[in-house]
């Protein structure tokens, strides 16, 4: 029954989960990102990650087949002040699923830093957000090394336009789409069903079943559903 409930909302089996996650990301990029950039007053956003040391925001902006940065991965977003449309760019290599959501702007022979500098010249933004924050660890994912490399690579005029992007990244994280809300309701129902079973006499044997047994039963059910 749990599998049927998840399958009805596209959250089971694992292949369906992948399709669903891509659709959720597509919706967020199209619905939430333009609003977040406008509301925060930024017309450019750079999200920089390094292999084995990802910015926490990075995983919320990429597809299921590219959950971790490759060498140096840079995502760039430019909001057109006239149309409100956001150009989504991937600097460096990207996965097949990413091809449908991001423009690959790398030119032959360019390094990621040369490419980033060129994009900034093309877009000429007035306010550039990077993930630095005094208040939120989740919005403070830009490493000191990458920040120095970025400043060294771009033109001096753009260095002066870089600002801490907490106002943008918080808005990106906090706003959910209708599809996300629907899936949350599904997961909530499944969670209650798991609790109802593991706390019932269908599973618990008085005097024998321990709280640890209940914990492992919950983990097993969740794992069998393709989650962890």
Predicted regions and their residues:
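A composition/biophysics-driven feature that prefers long, compositionally simple stretches
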Residues: 1-223, 227
